[in-house]
Amino acid sequence: MDLISTFLLHFLLLACSLPPGAVSLRTALRKSGKVGPPLDIKLGALNCTAFSIQWKTPKRSGSSIVGYTVFYSELGSDKSLREQSHNVPVGQDTLITEEVIGDLKPGTEYRVSIAAYSQTGKGRLSFPRHVTTLSQDSCLPPEAPHQPHVLVVSDSEVALSWRPGENEGSAPIQSYSVEFIRPDFDKSWTIIQERLQMDSMVIKGLDPDTNYQFAVRAMNAYGFSLRSQPSNTIRTLGPGEAGSGRYGPGYITDTGVSEDDDASEDELDLDVSFEEVKPLPATKVGNKKSKKTSVSNSEMDSRLAQPTSASLPETTVAVPPTPAQRKGKNSVAVMSRLFDMSCDETLCSADSFCVNDYAWGGSRCHCNLGKGGEACSEDIFIQYPQFFGHSYVTFEPLKNSYQAFQITLEFRAEAEDGLLLYCGESEHGRGDFMSLALIRRSLHFRFNCGTGMAIIISETKIKLGAWHSVTLYRDGLNGLLQLNNGTPVTGQSQGQYSKITFRTPLYLGGAPSAYWLVRATGTNRGFQGCVQSLAVNGKKIDMRPWPLGKALNGADVGECSSGICDEASCINGGTCAAIKADSYICLCPLGFRGRHCEDAFTLTIPQFRESLRSYAATPWPLEPQHYLSFTEFEITFRPDSGDGVLLYSYDTSSKDFLSIIMAAGHVEFRFDCGSGTGVLRSEDTLTLGQWHDLRVSRTAKNGILQVDKQKVVEGMAEGGFTQIKCNTDIFIGGVPNYDDVKKNSGILHPFSGSIQKIILNDRTIHVRHDFTSGVNVENAAHPCVGAPCAHGGSCRPRKEGYECDCPLGFEGLNCQKAITEAIEIPQFIGRSYLTYDNPNILKRVSGSRSNAFMRFKTTAKDGLLLWRGDSPMRPNSDFISLGLRDGALVFSYNLGSGVASIMVNGSFSDGRWHRVKAVRDGQSGKITVDDYGARTGKSPGMMRQLNINGALYVGGMKEIALRTNRQYMRGLVGCISHFTLSTDYHISLVEDAVDGKNINTCGAK
């Protein structure tokens, strides 16, 4: 033990032996009354403007702690800035304290200390610690959402949907806020709802006949985004327009059917409200406006028109039956739960709502549209809705139907009674309305124009569990019902009024106020079963929830096709998809077909079928910048239907797209450079089942369309933008997802028919090699599918017929005949060519000098004699060529700094032999033809060498327009002999060729 240690030990022993009145060592070793610093201090950055700090109470404090102060200062580059403080009160029995310090600078380092306070004053500061807030890049708010889409529902309501921006920022999006402006009246935006948890809503209580725009902001943990691009200006319907009027709270709060209720829902002056796209809110008991009345059967019957059917009007007001069990993984929940109390006292789970049950008493909780399960927590994809007796789906009110309408419905019932359709002037059947209901397995079509009801009853009853189709038609007072294409039943309403006012939603499968509709519709039961299709006035209604479909809201709805794919066995990479409520197809990848994709085959000429959801995809051959300003497609196709998409591509991050579609028998070419859509439409309709040639092109924002020999159609896209960038594949015959297509593309259905040729900017898209993906593409009925060309020949479709391109050594319609004699003088047919890659030949068609001589004869004014150039050709690529253009003989070359073209005019397409000699020495060139004398020329710039890596072609070449940059569109139609290079290097045209197509002996047939 050293000297110091010995001294301290003796000092401690002395201190312990002091009497009580003496000063203790503990007091002597510290300042009197000072509280120690907090313990176990922990610092952490919360975000870019705040940090958190946590500590424990100091040990052995002489007096009770009354509070703390956090001292913090920003550390600059050279010195610390002014110190700031934050006081923290002490909670009861708090051993650990945690606090957040905010309003700080992003990405900044702070020095932090803490001191405790007691009754005796400030304690000792803790040892300083450092913490740095997160950088600004780590705390970004979201990007603005995409421009919202608005659907006008009535004179006071619109449905709004939007997609989030491309970047959600540094944290997930938590909610949205919605704003509106009336451009004709307002100068600033008004927020109508904040912290919305979804991306589609219905706005109620708007002013009728008024212009509106809407915008959306997204919010995450770091703040709000910028305002989205405002929606297109929309105008709410006028009070007198068909389909006008409010639905929702304005109707559902009136629970009675009193005839003396003078309050008019149309006169409600509601404030703007913002609601989720979900079923109508709860019907409340005891509404002071309502008064239940009783109407006798005789009173009701006296108000009905006599139907043509002998059946008397029937009314079903029995106890609602137990709904059919929901089947499949998407529809698990049973009948909505019944409670003994009213909705005022019932608490429903999230994604559900309450409706009072007047038939049973009490109330029921119903799942919102798209939700299911015991707690309405399961997502249900609805395409073919299934109803359970208490279900319904709502669509916008019938429009343009006040005088006449036609509705077609395909359904399968599981119970004898139930309401299928209802739309009217009020939610409770008062005034004008139309309805379709099942009553004891008979269909009842009822409508009232305001002065008396018509009841039209089907003559035959439906079969439970079987599919049925029913068509309703009304024109003025007259109505018609047709079941399963049977004999129509007609009827007529009473009185003089012939128009129907439709203000409520169109209800399918039931209605929230079905209990009160019994007098009008004849039943208080909801439908039980499935609906496969619904069409109004000739337009098929997409029954999926909005915004994908037209269903605005609903209650307790399942999916009829749920589980249909559970037992499916799609092989070879096929996937199952429901195509009807009770049937499926396998989406087979390219090269497979059959019910389960069991058959492998080679795709030759694609056949597309709308019923099989066919499509194929191919990437753009070159990068997008090659197609920004010019795009041209040539397509040969045979349509089997008047509607469908032929070709489509688009840009995912802008409005750019181009589409070629069939629409009502016409061909339409649509494109958008980002500032407006151009639509070009063929003048005449196309004959179905026949082959047609189509050419469309776009230069900047100008478009051209020509079908067969119809008049050329020209048009222009709107706006000032002139380029189109497409970053997706080219989709042919259909698209994978019709919900993702651009709004103005016109794409609604897959194409039904065949496509045998697609050429993009002179480049052929080959089915076998270039198609990279697709589903359910089969072979068309065409001779080329049977591979008729023998000995390696390739089949070239020519509408209904074909041509064979035969390899060297074979000839005949199907290349079936071998050429046994040597070909001294080859004959070319316009799609022929000979190829040479011998270095001794190629070096004589490159470098600083070139000399070529040949004899030829032809009957065509255009055709290529000789070509050598880079492949692929680029701007200012080196090349050398000799050929006929519009009757003139042209010698051209480019040494890298510009093209030289030396031309000799003459009658060279006379079918006689002609001699031509083309000589180049550096930049200078000369061509001599027969006795016409020499023509000379010189290439521009400084380049003197011909630098080429490609092969030499004689008489033509593959993809001639593409490879020559459209200098030549076809090969020679004629013969060539005596081909000599460098004055003395004689080439045996056929024997020296490494490849060739369609070569025969000159003069042979």
UniProtKB/Swiss-Prot annotation:
Cell location: Secreted, Extracellular space, Extracellular matrix; Synaptic cleft; Presynaptic active zone
A GO BP entry: positive regulation of cell-substrate adhesion
Question: Which residue ranges have biased composition labelled Polar residues?
Answer: 305-314
Look up the record and report any one GO term of the cellular component aspect: interstitial matrix
Renumbered to this chain, region (Disordered) spans 281-328
Residues annotated as glycosylated are: 47
Query: What Pfam family does this protein match (any one)?
Result: EGF_Pikachurin
| Coiled coil regions, renumbered to chain | none
Please report the stretch or stretches of sequence annotated as the EGF-like domain: 339-377, 561-598, 780-816
Classification via Gene3D superfamilies: 2.60.120.200, Immunoglobulins, Laminin
Domain of life where this protein originates: Eukaryota
Return the CDD domains for the record. Answer: EGF_CA, FN3, LamG
Is Phosphoprotein a UniProt keyword of this protein? Answer: no
* The entry's keywords: Cell projection, Disulfide bond, EGF-like domain, Extracellular matrix, Glycoprotein, Heparan sulfate, Proteoglycan, Repeat, Secreted, Signal, Synapse
The record's subunit annotation is:
Interacts with DAG1 alpha-dystroglycan. Interacts with GPR158 and GPR179; transsynaptic interaction is required for synaptic organization of photoreceptor cells.
As for what it does, the entry says: Involved in both the retinal photoreceptor ribbon synapse formation and physiological functions of visual perception. Plays a key role in the synaptic organization of photoreceptors by mediating transsynaptic interaction between alpha-dystroglycan and GPR179 on the postsynaptic membrane. Necessary for proper bipolar dendritic tip apposition to the photoreceptor ribbon synapse. Promotes matrix assembly and cell adhesiveness.
Q: What is this protein called?
A: Pikachurin
Taxonomy, top ranks, is: Eukaryota, Metazoa, Chordata, Craniata, Vertebrata
Q: What gene codes for this chain? A: Egflam
